[in-house]
Amino acid sequence: LYSGGFIWRSPELELNDVGFLRQADEIRQYLDVKGQFLTPTDWYRGASLGFGQFTTYDFEGNLNRLQFDLNGNVNFKNNWEANIRMIHKPLININTYLRGGPRWRFSEENGIFLSAGSDRRKRYNVNVRIGKSQAKEDNFSFTSYSISMGYQPTNALRLSLETSYRNAPSKTQYVTQGNFLNKNFYILA
């Protein structure tokens, strides 16, 4: 399986009159390729491996983001499942971080996300997810944990409960900007 796409958010398109659109200066391209293994074996019903890539540009032609991810999924014989996703972001520039200033470049980032879940066809099921991402220069990281439980008393009704915890310390926070000798400067903490 494969998919690809192109997203264009033009600065000329006036959607921000209501104030919801943070950035309209964006051109995004993405590509996903997935291989599926549909023939059951002794231990799984189906599995898949995938690769994804996307880039983001602004309307000045600057490459602002480059991201690659590798993912896999296994549906076991008992219909439980396990997933893994690894992400590599060698380039992260954000135009809006300095609030009107130049682009801000974050350091390279790598992450891994794992999940496992019980059979969703059963009346009760549970899913557990863990994620960890770390910037190369140790200025950003996050760790996330979540668990969800489902109960389906009838075919027409399903009840779910999910709780999660996320810790995302950032050593790069915008404080303010100023001007000295006609040169703009930005203060980060």
Where do the model's predicted regions map?
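Exposed, low-structure sequence patches enriched in small/polar residues
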Residues: 1-189
